[in-house]
């Protein structure tokens, strides 16, 4: 790569949107987890908030597929970014990435987006709680704290199934060995089948264990990411001890595609059953300016559902207002948007909405 690649005059800054990137490195983190590192062909500074995520635009067996992954790298290393992916037995996308994505592969990403980050919630004392591959956004935050010499009292508690499942193990130990105010605690559900010894905490994270590791956990800003049962257990401990939940922040993995399809089918059946009971005067018109198509929909139906009924395909990944993939511009009218961090305040001010979680309050016009 030539020195001109890093010319600050020609270097662009990453903004929320659609970008072409190329895989430049693949790292085997554990037996079933890989990190994929990306750069742009034209120099781009990948600025984002530690904890945010991107959505990959892929083609698998001839079908367009969108999937969101947290950025595991730190914005303090701005010319590239990384995602860390666990290979799931029935995971269509994760298996495809592990089998097909290699150095030189090109793809499209959308983002960065997400409210789960340490920039918007600064604190002097931080507790990070992660389970399994939920360590990825917290690793981005930890790398950021380390690289920027942040004056933060950080306690990090990570739970893994076995010692060989500990993601970023060596790097975490390196980081926490060099900063006096950083403390690392690792919990393994059990030892390795190979018999590898594990002298650390064993079992599942519980109140007694948390109190032993982090006695002042109720005084900290808490960032949590992991499987739903893990986060549910964490919240139960916190709430039962009077923790102020305004200082608790979490990132979940969301529903699986099968769950989303089941929800869609259930809602479609419900909508059909209720159609006869709806006064047509209550229905609202949704117009799509680029296609010249419009449709009247029932109250509480989303802009995305309106587009689908017209045969218009607005890209979508999570279906829950998290990933930001379905962002479109509203030209007229009012909507109610109940998102989960997938859109910035700046984009909202500019008239953008997330079609998957926006329901019209009046007749609306959409640029699509």
From Swiss-Prot:
Q: What are the alphabetically sorted keywords of the record?
A: 2Fe-2S, FAD, Flavoprotein, Iron, Iron-sulfur, Metal-binding, Monooxygenase, Oxidoreductase
Cofactor(s) essential for the protein? FAD; [2Fe-2S] cluster
- Asked if the keyword Iron belongs to this entry, the reply reads yes
User: GO: which molecular function terms?
Assistant: 2 iron, 2 sulfur cluster binding; metal ion binding; monooxygenase activity
**InterPro entries cross-referenced by the UniProt entry:** 2Fe-2S_ferredoxin-like_sf, 2Fe-2S_ferredoxin-type, 2Fe2S_fd_BS, Beta-grasp_dom_sf, Cbr1-like_FAD-bd_dom, FAD-bd_FR_type, Flavoprot_Pyr_Nucl_cyt_Rdtase, FNR_nucleotide-bd
Domain 2Fe-2S ferredoxin-type: from-to ranges: 284-368
Entry's cofactor comment: Binds 1 FAD per subunit. FAD is the native cofactor, but activity is slightly higher with FMN. Binds 1 2Fe-2S cluster per subunit.
Q: What this chain does, per the record?
A: Involved in degradation of glycine betaine. Part of a Rieske-type oxygenase system that catalyzes the conversion of glycine betaine (GB) to dimethylglycine (DMG). This subunit is the ferredoxin reductase component of the system. NADH is the preferred electron donor.
**Which proteins does it associate with, and in what oligomeric form?**
Monomer. The system is composed of an oxygenase subunit (BmoA) and a reductase subunit (BmoB). Maximal specific activity is obtained when the ratio of BmoA to BmoB is 5:1.
- Protein known as: Glycine betaine monooxygenase reductase subunit
Organism of origin: Chromohalobacter salexigens (strain ATCC BAA-138 / DSM 3043 / CIP 106854 / NCIMB 13768 / 1H11)
Q: What gene makes this protein?
A: bmoB
């Amino acid at each position: 790569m030539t020195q001109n690649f890093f010319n600050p005059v020609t270097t662009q800054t990453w903004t929320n949107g659609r970008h072409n990137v190329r895989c430049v490195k693949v790292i085997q983190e554990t037996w079933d987890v890989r990190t994929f590192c990306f750069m742009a062909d034209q120099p781009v500074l990948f600025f984002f908030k530690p904890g945010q995520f991107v959505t990959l635009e892929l083609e698998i067996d001839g079908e367009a597929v969108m999937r969101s992954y947290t950025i595991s790298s730190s914005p303090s290393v701005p010319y590239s970014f990384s995602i860390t992916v666990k290979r799931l037995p029935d995971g269509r996308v994760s298996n495809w990435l592990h089998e097909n994505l290699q150095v030189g592969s090109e793809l499209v990403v959308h983002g960065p987006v997400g409210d789960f980050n340490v920039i918007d919630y600064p604190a002097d004392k931080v507790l990070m709680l992660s389970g399994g591959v939920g360590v990825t956004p917290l690793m981005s935050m930890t790398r950021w704290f380390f690289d920027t010499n942040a004056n933060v009292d950080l306690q990090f508690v990570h739970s893994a199934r076995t010692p060989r499942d500990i993601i970023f193990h060596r790097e975490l130990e390196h980081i926490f060995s060099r900063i006096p105010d950083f403390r690392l605690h690792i919990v393994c559900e059990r030892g390795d089948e190979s018999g590898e010894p594990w002298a650390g905490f064993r079992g599942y994270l519980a109140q007694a264990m948390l109190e032993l590791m982090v006695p002042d956990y109720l005084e900290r800003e808490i960032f949590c990411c992991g499987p739903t049962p893990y986060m549910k257990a964490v919240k139960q401990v916190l709430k039962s001890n009077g923790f102020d939940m305004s200082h608790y922040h979490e990132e979940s993995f969301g529903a699986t595609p099968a769950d989303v399809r089941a929800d869609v089918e259930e809602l479609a059946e419900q909508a059909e059953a209720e159609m006869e009971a709806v006064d047509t005067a209550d229905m609202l018109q949704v117009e799509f300016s680029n296609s010249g198509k419009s449709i009247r929909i029932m109250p509480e139906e989303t802009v995305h559902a309106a587009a689908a009924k017209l045969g218009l395909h607005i890209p979508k990944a999570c279906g829950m207002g998290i990933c930001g993939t379905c962002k479109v511009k509203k030209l007229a009218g009012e909507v109610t948007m109940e998102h989960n961090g997938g859109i910035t305040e700046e984009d909202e001010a500019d008239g953008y909405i997330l079609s998957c979680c926006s329901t019209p309050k009046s007749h609306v016009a959409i640029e699509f």
